[in-house]
Structures are given as C-alpha cells and as structure tokens.
Design a protein with these regions (language model features):
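Active-site neighborhood of HAD-like aspartate-dependent phosphohydrolases
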Residues: 1-42
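Conserved SAM-binding loop
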Residues: 14, 92, 112, 143, ...
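Metal-dependent phosphoesterase signature
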Residues: 35, 58-94
Length: 216
C-alpha cells in the first residue's frame, strides 16, 4: 500500500494569507501602542488566533483579562475577514492548482488541515473548495498543532489510515503534528526550519504525484 490521501495546510501552502494576518495584527498592535514586525508575524504561522494574541501581549509584557483578549481577537478578525473577502483565485500559490488537479485525476483523496476558523471563506473565495473530500479547520479541532488532532481527524473523515497520508505544511508545528500522527510530511519553505519533514521544497511547483509516491 502507498499514498492514499494528501492533507493540506491552508495558509502558506495553498494561499498566502499570512500577509493579511500580518496587516490585521499590526493594526491591532498599533491601537495598543505596540509595534509589530514581519519577523514576529512569522512566529504566529500555524498558531491559533487566541494563542497569537497571547504571544503578542507576552512580547510586550502586557497582561489583560480573558474577556478583553477575546474582544481584541475579534476586532483583529473583523479586519482580517474584510481583507480576505476580496481574495480571488489569483491568490492561490504557484503549483497548487496543477497538483490538486493531478491528485483528483488519480483518485487520491484530498483533505484540509488548517488552524484557521476562516478556512471555508478562503476556500470559497479562491475556488478551491470543490477539490476537497474533507475539511478540518479551527472550528472543529480543540488542540492546536503540534498536536496531530487536525490531521488525524482529516484522515478519519477520509477513511484512510494515517500511514498512507502525506501532509503539506509551511509551519514547523504542522510538520511536527504530521509526524506525531504517523504521517509523512512535505515542508513548504526552508530546510532549516522544516528539516524534520521527509522532503522540503520551496513551493508546490516542485511537487507532482510521482514525487509524493516516491516517499513510500
Ligand atoms: P484564524 P493555517 C493559520 O492557518 C495561520 O497560519 C495562523 O497565522 C492563524 O493565526 C491561524 O490559522 C488562525 O486563523 O484567525 O483565521 O482562525 O496555516 O493553519 O492554515
Ligand atoms: Mg500554514
């Protein structure tokens, strides 16, 4: 037995929503009188909304009650949703559509494993939704990556044993989650950060069905 399913992270793998997260978090940080850099934003990739805010407050040595934190997180989300509402298929990352088409044509199951609570909106706007046989997002999971829950739920929904799944991830926490879940991982980004993955590539243009099957 070999490859049966591919599970995709969303932000940083299929679409570049990190730039919108950055702009919205920056806007929020500025209202709190804080600065927020792209380097700090890097550390929020794959991390849930509430945890991201907690980190930003920690970096600034700020504390506030949970109620206030929830208020700020939803303020940021409002701005973020406004930004992603204008997304189109042009914002799908290089190589993604070609690979998804090839997987579909070869009856490989396709699942989403994202921490985002806005994943469905993004998939709708970019026209990616019809490719997916199962969607697992931040509304479904209770434990964040590196916990393997998001991918294990995906495999379960697809009816595939984890060992026949390959995960595509741009965040080291996501690669760790895939490995903990007994799946193979392809890292999208740099070797230094994602070295634990079986294969690391710059983007999906470097991947076709044969490359994935060769991991087995
Ligand atoms: P939301 P992924 C993650 O998406 C993003 O990388 C991360 O920056 C974001 O905080 C998280 O989703 C939650 O997003 O605020 O939309 O629920 O990489 O897991 O697809
Ligand atoms: Mg990601």
């Amino acid at each position: 037995m070999g490859l049966e399913a591919c599970l995709f992270d969303l932000d940083g793998v299929l679409v570049d929503t990190a730039k919108y997260h950055y702009l919205a978090w920056k806007q929020l940080a500025n209202t709190l009188g804080l600065d927020f850099t792209e380097k700090e934003n890097e550390q929020l990739k794959g991390i849930s909304r509430v945890e991201s805010l907690r980190k930003i407050l920690n970096w600034a040595g700020m504390e506030m009650p949970q109620e206030k934190q929830d208020e700020l997180a939803s303020l940021k989300n409002g701005w973020y949703v406004e930004m992603i509402s204008g997304m189109t298929q042009n914002e799908v990352l290089p190589g993604a559509l070609k690979l998804l088409d090839e997987l579909k044509a070869n009856h490989i199951k396709i699942g989403l494993g994202s921490a985002s609570k806005n994943a469905k909106l993004i998939l709708d706007n970019t026209g990616l939704k019809p490719y997916f046989d199962a969607l697992v997002d931040g509304n479904i999971v209770s434990k964040s990556k590196p916990d393997p829950e998001v991918f294990l739920r995906g495999a379960e929904l697809l009816g595939v044993s984890p060992e026949y799944c390959v995960v595509f991830e741009d965040a080291s926490a996501g690669v760790e989650a895939a490995i903990k879940g007994n799946m193979k991982a392809i890292g999208i980004g740099n070797e230094e950060e994602l070295g634990e993955a079986q294969l690391v590539v710059e983007d999906l243009t470097a991947i076709d069905l044969r490359t994935i099957q060769n991991l087995f």
